[in-house]
């Protein structure tokens, strides 16, 4: 079981540099490359810190390449020798230490949108994340189903059809997560039954959004056959069990409950908490003492 956190490291006080279109227009792709290299250097620094602190699961930032899919960015960044050199270093560490690395595209990457242009841009973003995760030696691209658009069953079908039309490389890495407002665990399992996408279970989202049906963990586990160790998300509500907002830390109660329901199932757990690595470290140490 590997425990991890997402993107930023509060102890290192890391930041990932972004770029405005106007600045890119004025300074050219050289500026995009400059910031990209700094972001990869930050990622490498975090990877080293994680290894020093026995954290073997990490979600890389989606913002490593500024303006990654914007038309102004005509830089073939994934083939740039400097990018290849630093990502080779990152990937070597990831592979040598069996660290799991994932990415999580943002809310505007919506495969099941009824608007073809939104789907087109979503696929572009997934292609960017696919290139990024391959260079980093990662394995997972986490995505939500999207919107219901007044007809949840049709929305599920659209997601499945869009998924099946993706490149084999993206399909190999894409995992579908239940969300906290619209698509329950049962819903994403329904989508899996259409297109075989693995299901990333988020226990806090389930607490906030469920139909009262008990979670079938064996069914979730089965969706990962051929895709490696299941990935699970955990967070604690800021002011209550079903508060959609994330607390700075994950509570001992919530973590122990997840371990209880998992039983003998081996899974990697992503902590989604405002205090990032600080939320993970106590539980890493706890597991190491067992």
Language model features with spans:
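Alpha/beta catalytic barrel-like cores
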Residues: 1-100, 107-122, 130-140, 165, ...
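Active-site groove signature of glycoside hydrolases
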Residues: 136-150
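Short beta->alpha junction loops/turns
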Residues: 148, 180-181, 276
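Multi-pass alpha-helical transmembrane bundles in non-GPCR membrane proteins
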Residues: 152-163, 174-178
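Short acidic, Gly/Ser-rich segments with clustered Asp/Glu that frequently serve as metal-coordination loops
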Residues: 183-184, 204-210
